[in-house]
Amino acid sequence: MPRIIGIDIPAKKKLKISLTYIYGIGPALSEEIIAKLQLNPEARAAELTEEEIGRLNSLLQSDYVVEGDLRRRVQSDIKRLISIHAYRGQRHRLSLPVRGQRTKTNSRTRKGKRKTVAGKKK
């Protein structure tokens, strides 16, 4: 398993797919990186030479925000929204959907397991 910026990527998968195992790199960015470094997109990750891995590491560290830095940036953005009392920040704080989805039904992922409320007595 080749190790790129501290992450083990799958050796048997094609390079385009293997790079997507790094947080912050999707299929489009993976293709862009491969084109920029002039690597063979059909090659397997195990076929990378030490020199190519070094070029890949240096490019990702210098030009892209990925892995821990990206996770920290996202968390700091959420904390900033909460601290300035923005609507989106309040939705994050209350663990509710942030982007305007309905909450009367659905949104169970954000709200968590159902909490039973006693029925109204007649």
Swiss-Prot record:
Gene Ontology cellular component list: cytosol; small ribosomal subunit
Glycoprotein among keywords: no
Keyword Ribonucleoprotein: yes
Biological-process GO terms, alphabetical: translation
Keyword annotations from UniProtKB, A to Z: Ribonucleoprotein, Ribosomal protein, RNA-binding, rRNA-binding, tRNA-binding
Region spans: Disordered: 93-122
GO MF entries: rRNA binding; structural constituent of ribosome; tRNA binding
Pfam families: Ribosomal_S13
Start-end of Basic residues biased regions: 101-122
Record function comment: Located at the top of the head of the 30S subunit, it contacts several helices of the 16S rRNA. In the 70S ribosome it contacts the 23S rRNA (bridge B1a) and protein L5 of the 50S subunit (bridge B1b), connecting the 2 subunits; these bridges are implicated in subunit movement. Contacts the tRNAs in the A and P-sites.
Recorded family membership: Belongs to the universal ribosomal protein uS13 family.
Subunit relationships: Part of the 30S ribosomal subunit. Forms a loose heterodimer with protein S19. Forms two bridges to the 50S subunit in the 70S ribosome.
Protein name, UniProt field: Small ribosomal subunit protein uS13
UniProt organism field: Chlamydia abortus (strain DSM 27085 / S26/3) (Chlamydophila abortus)
